[in-house]
Amino acid sequence: MAKAATSKKEASKVEAKKPAARLGAKKTVSKSEESVKTSQSVKNSPSRTGSSSPQKGGKKGAVGEIKQVIGAIVDVQFEGALPNILNALETDRLGSRLILEVAQHLGENTVRTIAMDTTDGLVRGQKVFDTGTQICVPVGEATLGRIMNVIGEPVDEVGPIVTTKTRSIHQKAPEYIEQSTESEILVTGIKVVDLLAPYSKGGKVGLFGGAGVGKTVLIMELINNIAKAHGGYSVFAGVGERTREGNDLYYEMIESRVNVNPKENDGSTKGSKCALVYGQMNEPPGARARVALSGLTIAENFRDEGQDVLFFVDNIFRFTQAGSEVSALLGRIPSAVGYQPTLATDMGALQERITSTKTGSITSVQAIYVPADDLTDPAPATSFAHLDATTVLSRSIAEKGIYPAVDPLDSFSRMLDPLVVGEEHYAVACQVQTILQRYKALQDIIAILGMDELSEEDKLLVGRARRIERFLSQPFHVAEAFTGSPGKLVSLEDTIKGFKGLCAGDYDDLPEAAFYMVGSIDEAIEKGKRLMAEASS
């Protein structure tokens, strides 16, 4: 009886020492249920004070204490069994809930964890509770129209995400036998993309570019064009980018009716098409290293329910960068250019999950920042192997004022195959690239000797190349406020027709300016006639 009374007292002490936030209402229904189960598990678990050697696999509700805090890395010591690798631990930080993810098992019953939020306010000796599971996020239609953080908590101040469905952010990639192998083009309405580097439905697309060449604007235009035409669900993962851009995107989605404004709909987001998961620049590296996985988990759930999902990531380089920061804090020896030694493994674990199955598809569009415009940098170079199409944004094209600043010669797609796109499309794309390649080769001669030294044939080719270059520009819907021009969505048929005529020389009589920032070729002809009439008057 005395022993039983003692154990009850010990259990009540453990209960009393739990953080206040743990007993409060959670932001998702599923989390509160998990919290109740965890507290019962702690209450009913036997005292482990007598155990000195770590047992295999810690039990849910095990209690440890903080031994060391180094930035985003927290060392926690347990008496008895250690939590499994990737388990989520929970503690109190200045009255709010802080999640730690187990990364390493050290000696002396200690685990090294990565914090999913800032560690300000943590102290040595503070109690930490093992949840017994990995980080789980809410999934399903309740997430649509909402902004969540890395652990699935809503940050849009619209109330809790009411769902009982949650899913671990660490999942295995689908088996090879489950994957779909069909090839189909995803038409974006952007001329340069659809003609020269078409996207694959259910494939992976990379937008490569340095700082300030238009990656985010292009992603926002793709969301606007595809999400509207496509009609399915989308998931946007903001990884280590500007908070302002995330805020703008949220309101633009409401304005373009992709999402429903909950403030005008009695707090409901029913009818929304896109879920947003943000881990922005100001977040610790732990959050930035995991937020892409959180977004992907939501997308995978929709795919497994039979949906065709669009998954946008801005920016995949920040995922690598966060992994590099975490790796250094964990004490791993850096690899090439200071990146983590597990760079290829980390990237592969994420990218292999972004795939289409026989149930549904995930079409992924990923912005990839290129440090110092160097495509051979290990971070962008590691991404190349996983992509079905690459859209390379060039600073030299942006300097000419041509937007989107897509490099027509560096961009590539495995879909540009006559068996997939058809003979006409393939032939026109090859003609355009041949003319632009010849123009690029002649630019040194033009710069040194001038146009007069070229042959008549080359002069004609240069004129066509300059018209093609300008016709590759296009006004965007999401940039209307900046350009003052209404956005244009161009069908694939109109795109092929326009470039076929340009290559054949059908529009050699029109001024070059007629082809700049227009949609279809008919608009260019109309603009050209207007310019010629103004010049002659």
UniProtKB/Swiss-Prot annotation:
Claim: Hydrolase is one of the keywords in the record: no
Q: Where is this protein chiefly located?
A: membrane
Q: Which Gene3D superfamilies match?
A: 2.40.10.170, Bovine Mitochondrial F1-atpase, Atp Synthase Beta Chain, Chain D, domain 3, P-loop containing nucleotide triphosphate hydrolases
Tell where it localizes.
Cell inner membrane
Task: State the EC number(s).
Answer: 7.1.2.2
UniProt enzyme class: translocase
Give the top-rank taxon of the lineage listed in the UniProt record for this protein: Bacteria
What catalytic activity does the UniProt entry give for this protein? ATP + H2O + 4 H(+)(in) = ADP + phosphate + 5 H(+)(out)
Here the segments flagged for biased composition (Polar residues) are: 44-55
Q: Does the keyword section mention Ligase?
A: no
Region annotation (Disordered) maps to: 1-61
Residues bound to ATP are 209-216
The Basic and acidic residues compositionally biased stretches are 7-18
What topology does it adopt in the membrane? Peripheral membrane protein
Biological function: Produces ATP from ADP in the presence of a proton gradient across the membrane. The catalytic sites are hosted primarily by the beta subunits.
**Which family, according to the similarity comment?**
Belongs to the ATPase alpha/beta chains family.
Name the HAMAP family on file: ATP_synth_beta_bact
Protein name, entry field: ATP synthase subunit beta
Gene that this polypeptide is encoded by: atpD
